[in-house]
A protein has these predicted regions:
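Conserved catalytic/acceptor-binding region of the Class I
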Residues: 130-131, 137, 141-187
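A short acidic, Gly/Pro-enriched loop at the edge of an enzyme's catalytic core
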Residues: 105-116
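Class I SAM-dependent methyltransferase SAM/SAH-binding core
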Residues: 51-55, 59-106, 131
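A short SAM/SAH-binding and catalytic strip from SAM-dependent methyltransferases
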Residues: 116-129
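Conserved class I S-adenosyl-L-methionine
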Residues: 2-50, 61-65, 82-85, 89-93, ...
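Short conserved AdoMet
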Residues: 45-47, 68, 127, 141
């Protein structure tokens, strides 16, 4: 490993630690992210007893929507506060969903352990989309379904993220823009 590699990993680690703080107050985003959940679940074709992983689950809106159909759902998020809120929401709604704190770039699940991997915006903030996608596909069963909601680059949030990337803290060389997930040519 070179000195540049060490620096790159250090920056990525710092990005993830900062993300835990930034996303711990998700209340600003809840109002305009929840409406996508039923659409993602329907698009994914989730059925009762499917094993489903919600990547970057936030407060659990998407995971709970899938659980209402009888799916066996695990919600994953990097931010401890969000995992706690998702767990509390699961209890309030009387739904059984396992929520775990983990990194999408190193998912703590066996290969081919989910029928469906879903995400509602959370996945797109992994600093290295190719690593995140590789992990999502690793835990997906053969012929499984992957479905997610993301903001396209040309709409408000995509433009906001582009400006933030330009003037925000420096990103590691391997980091890619979150809006790439919304570009059909890339995905």
């Amino acid at each position: 490993m070179t000195k540049d590699d060490d620096q790159e990993f250090k920056i990525i680690r710092e990005l993830k630690e900062n993300a835990k703080v930034v996303w711990s107050d998700f209340s600003l985003f809840e109002n305009f992210t929840g409406t996508a959940a039923p659409k993602v679940v329907k698009f994914a074709g989730i059925n009762a007893n499917d094993r489903v992983l919600d990547v970057g689950c936030g407060t659990g809106v998407l995971a709970l929507t899938a659980a209402r159909l009888g799916a066996k759902v695990v919600g994953q998020d990097l931010t401890p506060t969000l995992v706690e809120r998702a767990t509390e929401n699961s209890r309030i709604f009387g739904l059984e969903v396992d929520f775990v704190e983990s990194d999408v770039e190193q998912l703590p699940f066996e290969n081919a352990s989910f029928d469906c991997v879903i995400s509602q915006f959370g996945h797109m903030f992994a600093p290295r989309p190719s690593v995140a996608l590789s992990e999502m596909l690793r835990v997906l069963k053969p012929k499984g379904t992957i479905a997610f909601a993301t903001w396209p680059p040309e709409l408000f949030m995509g433009r906001f993220l582009k400006i933030n990337g330009k003037y925000g803290p420096p990103l590691p060389k391997s980091a890619e823009s979150p809006v790439l997930w919304g570009d059909v040519k890339v995905v």
